[in-house]
């Protein structure tokens, strides 16, 4: 290999030097490739990606200097183009060959040097080169077909100035895939059909003009004379007759038209008045139906606390007697004569109640009088028997309730009841009368049960059995 001009190596010298080792010659510095012809400037975008790919894959920084002129690239490209498109202009074959050879020569002249593993690189570069040339050529052909200023027989490979690279790629895509380009003609847009309003048969008809009246009168006569005359012929004849008509006859037709117009206005006013008279009741009813929906029946509000306690058996007369400071004995008899509670109330009592009877006072009692505390109040009149707690349960309820300490008595001791009355409680029977106990209880002596006001302690949750009247001995 001669050292006179190492940068310019012929293709044959590069090809023949493959058998020699890499140590026989010096690798010249890489120089940028010569610029292609102006006709191939539009192909630079497509080839730049493939060249960079090939450069990145080359090992040890060595670039391929293989001769592509011995390959039959034009035949491959022509066969591919024929398979895709079906036909090719014969005048463009030399152009394709010139582009391929000039591109390969420019590529090889600036990149001499051997490379290991050339077959794989050769195959990849050939496929990339053929695809890029095919896409570019298809874009050129589609650009010529789409209103290109150059004549169809021209061999120039430059596209029209109005086309761009993106348009060429899109056109090539539509050509290769066989898809149709969507139509963008604004005149082909579907027009929305206008819906005609239905005319009311009761609406009065508009009056016609004077010429229309004359046309009606003369149309029948013309049709009788010329049965084969078309509507256009009849219109021409009527127009000529109207022009030749005298002014007085025209005024007669105009007066008829004015009279018909006045009648039409009167009929139209009456028709609109009838519409107005019919529409308000219907619209008013619809508005009333919307504004006043049927009222929903709301159930009566239930009381928050079901308290069938003292309020159920204290009548206004009893409260009035209580306010008027009646005798405690009469009040006790009234309370005892009424049914206290039909059963145990499970609902909580109201938070504040003026009368909250407390448990009977915890006073020291003799042993024989303990059983009388557990018995319910005696009934002075026939009344339904309320359910009564057994003695142990009543005792537990009394122990569970925290009685307030005995305070000052607001009422004197309640008078006793007759000793012959029996008890309705299943507890122990009344003890036998003894001479130690008097029949009456003066206000100064001790008593077994009292009624007092207790505003501080909450009322009991069970039926009030706190007003206890023991049977006297």
Swiss-Prot record:
It is found in: Nucleus. GO terms for molecular function: chromatin DNA binding; RNA polymerase II-specific DNA-binding transcription factor binding; transcription coactivator activity. This is TOX high mobility group box family member 2. The gene is Tox2. Residues 189-199 have a biased composition (Basic residues). Residues 153-164, 373-382, 415-440 have a biased composition (Low complexity). Highly expressed in ovary, where it is restricted to undifferentiated granulosa cells. Expressed in hypothalamus, pituitary gland, testis and uterus. Residues 204-272 bind DNA. Keywords: DNA-binding, Nucleus, Transcription, Transcription regulation. Residues 25-63 are annotated as: Required for transcriptional activation. GO terms for biological process: female gonad development; positive regulation of transcription by RNA polymerase II; regulation of transcription by RNA polymerase II; response to gonadotropin. One of its GO terms (cellular component) is nucleus. Residues 8-20, 463-473 have a biased composition (Polar residues). It comes from Rattus norvegicus (Rat). It comes from the Eukaryota. Pfam families: HMG_box. Residues 1-42, 139-211, 277-302, 340-473 are annotated as: Disordered. InterPro entries: HMG_box_dom, HMG_box_dom_sf, TOX_HMG-box_domain. Putative transcriptional activator involved in the hypothalamo-pituitary-gonadal system. Residues 171-188 have a biased composition (Basic and acidic residues). A motif (Nuclear localization signal) lies at residues 172-201. SUPFAM superfamilies: HMG-box. Its main location: nucleus.
